[in-house]
Regions:
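Sec-dependent bacterial lipoprotein signal peptides
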Residues: 1-19
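Cross-family detector of peptidyl-prolyl cis-trans isomerase
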Residues: 19-205
Length: 205
């Protein structure tokens, strides 16, 4: 009977020791993962700080231009203002705008003619995060310079075309018009009907 008790106790001791070793073996993995996350966060903080320093330098170099710091993490200045209107685009509207994209040295990456007129269903389409928030500040016919960090443009991946990794950008945006989706649909139907009538007239003539 004593032998059985000793055997059971020995097996239990081995099992307990094995569990402790397994737990100890897993700890470095958790520590390693936590360390990696901390390093990643630190790198991102340094990256953002560096880009914000670049933007601050641009603002200092343009002392005559009044830049405003937004609550969304970007800076902007007015080229053309509209003080008569109070409405701005909101979710459920369609914004019609033009824009061009430059680097912080003012070199054109995408020209307005290259990008063409833009039609944006507010907060329902996947566009640059900075633009998404910036457009909602604008009144009709306003033109604004936006300074964006890469975190709210194309980030680490760029756009896989002309914009590389972690590039802060200057975007110059003109809001031509905006309207509700219902009004936009009506306008598109009216244009479609008008085009169809013109084609029929040309065929008859």
């Amino acid at each position: 009977m004593k032998k059985i008790i000793y055997t059971i106790a020995f097996v239990f001791l081995l099992a307990n020791t094995s569990c402790q070793k397994n737990q100890e073996a897993r700890k470095p993995i958790a520590n390693s993962s936590g360390s990696f996350m901390k390093q990643s966060v630190d790198r991102n903080k340094k990256l953002i700080a560096g880009e914000e320093a670049e933007i601050a330098r641009v603002i200092r170099q343009n002392k005559r231009v009044k830049f405003i710091a937004s609550t969304k993490g970007f800076w902007y200045s007015y080229i053309a203002t509209n003080t008569k209107d109070t409405l701005t685009p909101k979710k459920g509207d369609v914004a019609l705008f033009d824009y061009e994209v430059k680097d912080l040295k003012g070199r054109i990456i995408y020209s307005q003619s290259e990008l063409g007129p833009q039609t944006y269903f507010v907060d329902k389409q996947n566009i640059m995060m900075g633009l998404r928030d910036g457009i909602k500040l604008m009144h009709r016919n306003e033109k604004i310079n936006f300074l964006f960090t890469s975190a709210i443009t194309y980030g680490y991946h760029g756009d896989n075309k002309k914009i590389g990794t972690n590039k802060p950008l200057l975007c110059i945006v003109t809001l031509r018009d905006f309207m509700s989706e219902a009004n936009y649909d009506q306008k598109m139907k009216a244009n479609s009907t008008s085009d169809s009538t013109t084609q029929n007239d040309s065929i008859i003539n």
